[in-house]
């Protein structure tokens, strides 16, 4: 628990202190966000707000994770693990794709960055590298950072994926989560606040897995997760970085995270879900993100097949703005929904453990 608290503290400090420096730098360089002309009228006043604040979020995550391990040398903490590095590497790789996208938008002063093909290739490449590596690096107990079996709270033994199918599965998971968070990042503080809650839930889940790991505490209900404590540090550092960034990103936002932040944060959820064996449970924890990307898919499919739109605008947080909800009302209500789904997800996780031990 001490390591988790250190990770949060370092990440909050780095993010909250670095963000205003980025605001000054990007404002001086003229790196202002471009607004869609067909978006809600209230958003036009945000034109010129600095973007690429995801740099501060990623810096906070890196500092929180590695800073905690450096501090751990003083009290014999566990070292850096393959699981932690793979999740961090996935997030950083996707953040790099987002950074290129943001830079093109800012340099060309338009709301369109990388074309769809280039962006998709970047996401797929990141996912494939992650998928190939995450089944390697087995520890002395024979556990790899991930399992080829589909997982809810633990592996579902009846659903085992071949190596090729596992790679395709990871491409789907990584692409879905990175795009889902990207679509959600359309209102001040919405994505950062929701991410803080989802990763906070993952801190609880992975911390519990660490205390009930089959390697150290074999018995009913134990978990075959390779490095649960290190995953808890990644989750804690992410939550802390999002909280620090939210100080400046809350309405009215002084800076946006941009694709640099949203794609990276989607990678965090994807990586944590795969390495903690909770791919299906993650859908409950991040249900708001799932709803956002689903609204986009429904809007596109419905319009192409019927010529009509389900929502006034997608992602559907803009729909609620266009029907008269204030932006802050949408944000707070979506935060509340995320808190509820995170609570439900943690309850399902704990309930499964109780059932496993026969309680």
From Swiss-Prot:
Keywords: Cell cycle, Cell division, Cell membrane, Cell shape, Cell wall biogenesis/degradation, Magnesium, Membrane, Metal-binding, Peptidoglycan synthesis, Transferase, Transmembrane, Transmembrane helix
GO cellular component: plasma membrane
GO MF annotations in UniProt: metal ion binding; phospho-N-acetylmuramoyl-pentapeptide-transferase activity; UDP-N-acetylmuramoyl-L-alanyl-D-glutamyl-meso-2,6-diaminopimelyl-D-alanyl-D-alanine:undecaprenyl-phosphate transferase activity
Keyword Transferase assigned: yes
InterPro entries documented for this protein: Glycosyl_transferase_4 (IPR000715), PNAcMuramoyl-5peptid_Trfase (IPR003524), PNAcMuramoyl-5peptid_Trfase_CS (IPR018480)
Chief site of localization: membrane
Pfam families per record: Glycos_transf_4, MraY_sig1
Listed transmembrane segments: 3-23, 55-75, 80-100, 117-137, 156-176, 187-207, 231-251, 255-275, 280-300, 334-354
Cited CDD domains: GT_MraY (cd06852)
Catalytic reaction equation(s): UDP-N-acetyl-alpha-D-muramoyl-L-alanyl-gamma-D-glutamyl-meso-2,6-diaminopimeloyl-D-alanyl-D-alanine + di-trans,octa-cis-undecaprenyl phosphate = di-trans,octa-cis-undecaprenyl diphospho-N-acetyl-alpha-D-muramoyl-L-alanyl-D-glutamyl-meso-2,6-diaminopimeloyl-D-alanyl-D-alanine + UMP
Cofactor(s) recorded in Swiss-Prot or TrEMBL: Mg(2+)
Membrane topology of this protein: Multi-pass membrane protein
Pathway entry: Cell wall biogenesis; peptidoglycan biosynthesis
Disulfide bonds: none
Keyword Transcription regulation: no
EC number of the protein: 2.7.8.13
An individual GO BP term: cell division
Cellular location(s): Cell membrane
PANTHER family associated with the record: PHOSPHO-N-ACETYLMURAMOYL-PENTAPEPTIDE-TRANSFERASE, PHOSPHO-N-ACETYLMURAMOYL-PENTAPEPTIDE-TRANSFERASE HOMOLOG
Family: Belongs to the glycosyltransferase 4 family. MraY subfamily.
Function: Catalyzes the initial step of the lipid cycle reactions in the biosynthesis of the cell wall peptidoglycan: transfers peptidoglycan precursor phospho-MurNAc-pentapeptide from UDP-MurNAc-pentapeptide onto the lipid carrier undecaprenyl phosphate, yielding undecaprenyl-pyrophosphoryl-MurNAc-pentapeptide, known as lipid I.
UniProt cross-references to NCBIfam families, sorted A to Z: mraY (TIGR00445)
UniProt name for this protein: Phospho-N-acetylmuramoyl-pentapeptide-transferase
